[in-house]
A protein has these predicted regions:
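Catalytic domains of carbohydrate-active enzymes, especially glycoside hydrolases
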Residues: 1-4
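An active-site-proximal structural segment forming one wall of the substrate-binding cleft
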Residues: 9-94, 110-123
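Extracellular glycoside hydrolase catalytic/binding regions
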Residues: 77-94, 98-181
Length: 181
């Protein structure tokens, strides 16, 4: 179930938005009723979107996690709140804490952010699988180069996996601008 951070929490460190949370829970409950599994997938690429004038537009600002406008603590806050809301659903297969982070700050690398998030979630949910995407769009072909530091992450509950992505175009970018033919 992909979702956007700014839709579920319109103000960093604020409450979860009830209407969006209710939609998520309705979907999750339907999946549970059908004995299906759900992966909650924050689809923000390592960023928080600040809407221009409070609405979605081309003037939106995408703020990278780890700077003063969007701190690691802000990121941990939303996941701690989400985990508290969803921990009792049996159909939740895992929390994909961030889809395809890229261009993270050198001062706050993705592995630092991920470890803080792991710790925050485990304060409220010790059962659910944690899914950690690699750096630079979770690149499988460049994993050793860009995501090797993730091997040092520690889940105190030992229930964590890594997620790598492969795009089958000539440069593994996912743009498919050139054919293999």
């Amino acid at each position: 179930f992909p979702f956007r951070w700014e839709r579920i929490q319109s103000e960093m460190n604020g409450p979860l938005i009830t209407t969006e949370l209710d939609k998520m829970k309705e979907f999750v409950q339907a999946a549970e009723d059908l004995n299906m599994k759900v992966l909650l997938d924050m689809h923000n690429f390592g960023r928080y979107c600040v809407y221009s004038n409070g609405v979605n537009s081309d003037d939106n600002q995408f703020v990278v996690i780890g700077n003063a406008q969007c701190t690691v603590e802000n990121f941990c806050d939303v996941w701690k709140k989400l985990a508290a809301e969803f921990k009792d659903y049996k159909c939740i297969w895992g929390y994909d804490i961030m889809n395809e982070p890229y261009g993270m700050l050198r001062t706050t690398p993705w592995e630092t952010i991920a470890q803080a998030c792991i710790n925050a979630i485990r304060e409220v949910d010790t059962e659910t699988m944690l899914v950690i995407s690699g750096n630079e769009y979770s690149s499988a072909s460049r994993w050793k180069e860009v995501s090797d530091g993730l091997k040092n992450l520690v889940d105190p509950c030992d229930n964590m996996i890594f997620q790598a992505h492969v795009y089958f175009d000539w440069d593994a970018s996912g743009n498919y601008s050139r054919s293999y033919d």
